[in-house]
Structure formats: structure tokens, C-alpha cells
Amino acid sequence: MGITERLIEDVGIRRGVSRLTPEKIEKIVNAVLKGETGARLKTYAETCMRCGLCAEACHFALSHPGDPSYTPAGKVHQTMSVLLDKKGRVDPDFVYGMAQLAYTECNLCRRCVHLCPIGIDTAYIMSTVRRICHKLGVTPQYMQDTAHSHASTFNQMWVKDDEWTDSLIWQEDEAREEFPGLRIPLDKEGADIYYSVIAPEPKFRTQLIYQAAAIMHMAGVDWTMPAQTGWDNSDMCMFSGDFEMMGRLKRQHFESAQKLKVKRIVMGECGHAFRSVYDTGNR
């Protein structure tokens, strides 16, 4: 079964596809392939042996045994390989299926890379497919809404500055019942540690801030948290393919820490945010 046999409806993808023309698709695909990629993509495209070892690492493939279209190599075959072979001359219906596959059937986790005998980075290839989809204006609705929040507030949950500081003060008060001398220092210059979190913490899981503050307090750490934008280290734009906004987010994050002259940044739990901070968004 290929992607065309399992299409699902998404208003964001559908709306974006409805505005496409073959000429626009060809222009943007080739602009990305020629202007934003190079020998790396070409090497991956030409060296895959279709051995199938990558399938053993992919949770999508393991969830659909016997269907090669879910394997990492199969996903590349249905998307990037077609774009390269046809030099971007594909129709809007193809783009719909390509977007669904790239956004909903690959997590960019890179587990497949570790089993590939020649080290093909399928996540990089699929990330490039997402980049093309973003520049075409074809992104899943929920993901794009989150990216809009990043663009407007520099966090993914539409948290305003006063709501952020109120959450920190609230958790400091809560924690003092257990740790009377506990403080959550805001905008402290020269601290050893600048602690950053993801936006769902002040929005939904404020107790995680409490718990982190308790650890810092008991460890006697010299630390601080920012009172202004830059505190959210998450990055949905990395997932959507909006690399321009991704760069703005990371710049805001690092400049916030530099402004306070801290020695190091310590992050709360979030795998994608860590990748964005130390790797992708830092390029």
C-alpha cells in the first residue's frame, strides 16, 4: 500500500495544496534542491541499496509488517526520489501525499541511521521534504498553528510575558511550603546556570518548574531563569520546515542567556528542543 491509498484529510495541507500550480511546485522544489542541499543529498540518493535494514529500526515499519511503503527507504522512494527523478515536475495531488507522509509517517528520529550499513540519514532527507512543503505553504494545521505562536510570542503556547512570570512566582510560593528558603531567581546576572524549559510547562505542567527549582535549591546551585522571551527552548518550526523562524527562535534563546552573562544553559526535558538548541537551530 502506498501513500495514495491511505490519505487522511487535514485542513492545513488541503488549503495549501489548493493554492498550488505545477509551475510554482517546480520552481520551489528546484530552489530548495539547488540552493539548500548539495553533495550530501545527492550521495544519499545514489547510494541506497534498498537492503531493508532500516525497516528494523523504524516504528512505523514495525507497526505495518509486510508493507514496504512504511520503511524509511520506502518513504524516500515515494517522496524525494520522485522529486529528483522528475526535477520537481509533480502535481498538487502528489504534494498532498508527500506532505502527509513527511509530517505524519516519519518522526525524524534518526533510528534508521544506526542500522544503515552506509549511514544514510533518512531523517535529513525527510526534513528536506518538509522544508519543501513549508515553502509551498503545505503544512498540517496543528503544526502551523504552533509555529504561528512561536512567531508571535517566541513560545509555542501563546504564553504572554506576565503569564510566564506569574507562573514562576506561583511555583516559588508553592515550593516554599516544602522548602522555606527556596527562590526562583529571575534575570540574575552572572549566574552559573540559565535554566530554560518548554512552553507546555508554564501552560499545563507547572509542577515541573517546582521540581526543577527544588533540585537547584537542594543542590545549592547558582541559577536563574529569564523574565522575558527566550525562556522557551522548544521549536516546532524545526519540525515544520520553517528554518527562518527556527533561526530567530534560537537567536532569541542564546541572546537571552548572553544578556544575563550566565556560564551555561541547562534545559528541561525535551528531545526535540535539545536537538534544535545544540544542532539544527544553531547552524
List where the protein language model places each region.
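Iron-sulfur-cluster electron-transfer modules
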Residues: 16-20, 36-38, 42-45, 80-281
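Ferredoxin-type iron-sulfur electron-transfer modules and their immediate structural context
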Residues: 1-103
